């Protein structure tokens, strides 16, 4: 049994095996109806709990479909359905759920909730997102890059805007998959030093460049994410927009990257803010392949968690 809690907590060889398996599973499904079962059914007769303290489209649908394609069933639980950390301890919730289900995926705010769930659960726990990390997304991103351009090792990735939880997982992935990462954004939105330090210790070149044009020069992949959260107050949104506007990914900025550079965004996007529709719908963009690959990457993650 394995937990999938973060990129840096998983062996690099296991991460590589998951990416390779995800690609093979995707190829095996080409041309099949979405509800058709996979040839192999590693989740047959298995029940997976999908816990959402934060709203979700891609995470919920991709995990639900993936479990069903591999022969399992899902139980979707929201914060309103549970007493997670309110009235009942997370430890007790983890112990109880372990008696009912074979695997737990949790999308939560506080990373400590994920850690405690994994500590006390007797079944695999998967990090569907926390305020500090989003490893499933980055596995999909690596898969997407490699199916379009080949191995990501040695490539230059540029992250624009806010050094948020997705950026943090990208830095972990830089260390584990051997690519370099340049962050371009205002100083107050820099990634945490521990994430950059991990990648540097692994031999990746991690650079902070305030000038977005200089940052994307020679880039193989340019990545953007939303500048604001649904929970931000209006005044905070306006302030963030003013600070981050110079880091918008538009056609002019992409012209400074390599001619065959890819553009990614984990979605949902605020079009014309962090990136323009011209870029998002243009020839560099692979955002919808990226969204689809959440399904395939997570199926490989679930198989790994169960040793299947």
Curated annotation (Swiss-Prot):
SUPFAM superfamilies: Aspartate/ornithine carbamoyltransferase. This is Ornithine carbamoyltransferase. Carbamoyl phosphate binds at residues 56-59, 83, 107, 134-137, 266-267, 294. L-ornithine binds at residues 165, 225, 229-230. It comes from Ruegeria pomeroyi (strain ATCC 700808 / DSM 15171 / DSS-3) (Silicibacter pomeroyi). Pathway: Amino-acid biosynthesis; L-arginine biosynthesis; L-arginine from L-ornithine and carbamoyl phosphate: step 1/3. One of its GO terms (molecular function) is ornithine carbamoyltransferase activity. It is found in: Cytoplasm. GO terms for biological process: arginine biosynthetic process via ornithine; citrulline biosynthetic process; L-arginine biosynthetic process. The keyword Ribosomal protein does not apply. Reversibly catalyzes the transfer of the carbamoyl group from carbamoyl phosphate (CP) to the N(epsilon) atom of ornithine (ORN) to produce L-citrulline. The keyword Cell inner membrane does not apply. It catalyses: carbamoyl phosphate + L-ornithine = L-citrulline + phosphate + H(+). Disulfide bonds: none annotated. Keywords: Amino-acid biosynthesis, Arginine biosynthesis, Cytoplasm, Transferase. It comes from the Bacteria. Belongs to the aspartate/ornithine carbamoyltransferase superfamily. OTCase family. PANTHER family: ORNITHINE CARBAMOYLTRANSFERASE, MITOCHONDRIAL, ORNITHINE TRANSCARBAMYLASE, MITOCHONDRIAL. One of its GO terms (cellular component) is cytoplasm. PROSITE patterns: CARBAMOYLTRANSFERASE. Its main location: cytoplasm. Its EC number is 2.1.3.3. InterPro entries: Asp/Orn_carbamoyltranf_P-bd (IPR006132), Asp/Orn_carbamoylTrfase (IPR006130), Asp/Orn_carbamoylTrfase_sf (IPR036901), Asp_carbamoyltransf_Asp/Orn-bd (IPR006131), Orn/put_carbamltrans (IPR002292), OTCase_ArgI (IPR024904). Pfam families: OTCace, OTCace_N.
